[in-house]
Every structure is written in structure tokens, then in C-alpha cells.
Amino acid sequence: MQYKELLHKLLTGTDLSGKEMEECFSGIMLGEYPDSVIAAILALLQKKGVTPEEVAGAYFAIISKALPVQLGDNAVDTCGTGGDQAGTFNISTVAAIIANGAGVPIAKHGNRSVTSRCGSADVLEQLGYRILLPPDKTEMLFRETGFAFLFAPLYHPAMKAVAHIRRELGIKTIFNMLGPLVNPAKVHRQVVGVFDMRVMEIYAQSLIRTGCSHALVVHGKTENGDGLDEASICGPTRIVEIQNGEITCHDVEPETFSLSRCTIAELQGGDSSRNADILLRILDGSATKAQTDAALFSAAMACYVSGRATCIDDGLSKAKGSLESGNASKQFSRILALNAELAGK
């Protein structure tokens, strides 16, 4: 489709088909459109509101150009959209490590900080993880430990074509939604935290279209009613569950899982050094109860979607066992050691 025809459709508020969107984003990734046209497409999509078909079309365009990495069919990703401005520590990253200690294979897709002071890549790098490990060695690490971190800029080199345009636009675009979806390992099991409750249904429908087998899309609230792209122990959490093509929705409270409420201030993070310290304290048992419970809640969800647990309650039991036995800490030390060894070869 010529970009003038594409722009005309978007200007009139017409939704694109999945095929049209895939062709459009393939053109964007390949640098076939002028920067001004790409900026217009992104802004008009945002104004119109994206559909699941459009999100899925963009997904297929981006994933087809990602560096391939083979991590099997059962790996789980815990990744949020960011954008909630809450300043929490790296909850989903700690949750992934705890779940891995419970036997859950993890393919954590992440990046450096965009909307916070410390992204998942920043905190892992602070702890010594070599985030630029190439795909073949990442596969070796995963085979030995069941854990891999997939640094988004390494696996999505074509995304560089739009990075400066996104910065110049300075608004949320469809790319903010796509981040958690375009895991280069093509995971079928996910826990996705979203910053805006209004996009939960779009996410769920998009996940079905991209081949998801079991996922939880979550949006939490603070004690003040502000949104979080995490499951919350400060207030209620809405969970949209996708399993075998079916979508269900329910709201839960911390007390549903015998978790104590806390304030958002108790979950505040900081720079990579501060967040790395919190992560290690959670693993060694010296963190606050609020910090530990927040990580356990998200880890429980990862255990559930992996199939290692029959429900979130059972997942919480598995996650607690991972921490209390010391297995999460030992496993993470093993991951760091092997990661460094592979990076040095």
C-alpha cells in the first residue's frame, strides 16, 4: 500500500487490516518511509486508537525481523509496558528470578530505562549479567539454567529506524504496547503488566492473535487509585486471563492471597545500584515484607502461566518455596557465573 493511501485511511479514522498493518510496519522497519510519514502514522494510530488486528499485524512485522533465538515452547516472560510513573523497584525482574528458582523456564525480554530510573537491563547489568550475550550463547545459558535475558536493542536491530522518531514525538505510541509482545523467543506464556486499564482487552485479543497459550494481563492500583503496570499489593488488581483462546476477567485484592497491603512508598526503587540492592535483599531474605510480597505476587503468576502451579495461590506457595529454600538465590548465582563464562569465550 502506498503511504498516501495509508495516511488517508488513518486520517479518516479507518482501521487497518492485519495484513495492511503488517505491510505498513515492515515498510517502517525497512526504512521505506520518510521520517515525517512514520511520525504521522504513529500519531494518527494513537489518535484513532489501535485495534487487536493492528497490534497483531505490527507484531508479525517486527518479530519477522528480530534476531532468532530458540528457547523452546514453555518459556515464560514477565514484562510490563512501563509508563506508570510509580517509581517502583524492578518487580517483574525479581519475580522472574524467583519463578526460575521454582523451576519455571524464563525468557525475560527487557530494555534499559525509558520511563523509570532503572530498567530490567540496567539492574541485571549492575549485578554483573552480560546483557549483550549473543543468541547462540544465550541458548546455551538457557539450556543449562532455564533462564535467559533478551536485551531488546540487540534482538530488534530494525527498531533503530524509529528510535529517534519516537523520541522526537514525545508521546505514547503503539510501540509502548508492542514492547512486551515482541519477545524474540516468541513465547506463548506471559505475565504482562499494563499501565492503562483501557488497553487490557486489546492486549488480550492481540495475544490470542499472536499465538499465546496462557497469559495474564494485569493492571494494579495504588492506595490512591493510581495505575500500576504490575500486580498490586497496595490496592486491587484487575487480571485478564487468556488460556486456549478463551478470555476471562476478574478483580482481586491482596487479601485474596493472604498478602498484607502496603503503600506505594514502601515499593519505591531508585537507580540501578539501589534496585540491585533490593533484588539481592529479597533473594537473601533481608528485604522488607512489602518488597518481598510484591515480588512473590508477580512470581506466583509466572508459576501459574508456566503450568508449574494449578492456580495463583498454588503459584504463591511455589514462589515462597523458591525463596525460603534459598533456591532462587543459588540459581541466580549460577546464572550469573555461567553468563560471565559464556561472555568470556
Swiss-Prot record:
Catalytic activity, reaction form: N-(5-phospho-beta-D-ribosyl)anthranilate + diphosphate = 5-phospho-alpha-D-ribose 1-diphosphate + anthranilate
Co-factor(s): Mg(2+)
Binding, anthranilate 1: G80, N111
Q: Which GO terms describe its molecular function?
A: anthranilate phosphoribosyltransferase activity; magnesium ion binding
Name its species.
Chlorobium phaeobacteroides (strain BS1)
Task: Tell me what gene encodes this.
Answer: trpD
This protein is called Anthranilate phosphoribosyltransferase
User: Where does the UniProt annotation place the signal sequence?
Assistant: none
For this chain's record, the cofactor binding note is: Binds 2 magnesium ions per monomer.
Q: Looking at the UniProt record for this protein, which Gene Ontology cellular component terms does it annotate, in alphabetical order?
A: cytosol
UniProt KW Nucleus keyword: no
Residue runs in coiled coils? none
List residues binding anthranilate 2. R166
> Which residues hold Mg(2+) 1?
S92, E230
Please describe the quaternary structure of this protein: Homodimer.
| E.C. no | 2.4.2.18
Q: In its keyword annotation, does this UniProt entry include Nucleus?
A: no
